[in-house]
Amino acid sequence: MSTLASSGTPRDAKAWLVTPALAFIVALFVYPFAYGLVLSFEPMNGGGALANYTQFFTDAAMWPTVLVTLKLAVPATLINVGVAVPVAFALRRHSPYQKFATTLLVIPVTLGTVLVADGMLTYFGPNGWFPQALHGLRLYTDEVRLTHNYWGVLLSLIVSGFPFAFLLMLSYISGIDPTLARAAATLGANPWQQFRRIYLPLLVPGLTMAACLSFVQAFSVFPSAVLLGAPAGPTRVISIAAAEAAFENYDYSLASAIAIVMGFVQLLVVASMLGARRFFYSGPVTGGKG
């Protein structure tokens, strides 16, 4: 009996150690999601449990916000991940300039979305440095409009999202055993063949995760769409529709339904990317060293 009691004590201790983390997750993630899900089926104006979802998908001012958000999130994801791969590949080895270059590339993370948007208004605005430089160099004579439209929001998503994609790709590329490429080089593989035949297949899991996280971050765009876009026009994203329902119309039930739709679209895209990964790679999650 004493043996059973003593053997059960470590397991009970581990359970108690996990309890605070579980309580934290339930309080901050599970409960708000469950509450919002239930609230979405309780429309403020009645009409049945699915009234909010019916209103969203039949309102010409609401359902197009999904397409608008996708038109911003998908290109931003492709650009961020596509540029992050060669940059991370170039900085994969330790060198005197590697840390300096990495620090410069991740600076936007420390500034915050609002500060980045304010800086972009100063730099890319009609009277900003960038348009004035183009006009001064006679490279472009017409009016340059890179703010308060689609391009302003897209640029903001690229500037703020690239550091995350870069750091993810840098960690994956740095984790690939360099002796694999050196072995291929001894067999006559040039640098491009080394990248295409060795690094790229092993990077598929990292590419997928970076793309998923970049997409989720870009799809939830809100400050950039308001500050650098046209929130009543071409950059009225789904998060703006949810904010208007909650804070202008005080219809928290409809806002919850919009948030659920937003989460479902994100989940659908992420699941599609994770499923597509199996067609390109079926090995371990990383190509780690050793």
Task: Name each model feature, range by range.
Residues 1-19, 96-98, 271-290:
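Transmembrane alpha-helical segments of polytopic membrane transport and secretion proteins
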Residues 13-44, 60-143, 148-173, 202, ...:
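Membrane-water interface segments at the C-terminal ends of transmembrane alpha-helices
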Residues 46-49, 126-127, 172-182, 191-193, ...:
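Transmembrane helix boundary and interhelical loop/hinge segments in multi-pass membrane proteins
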Residues 187-188, 201:
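Glycine/proline-centered hinge or cleavage motifs at structural transition points of membrane proteins
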Residues 192-194, 232-233:
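Gly/Pro- and small hydrophobic-enriched strand-loop and loop-to-helix capping segments
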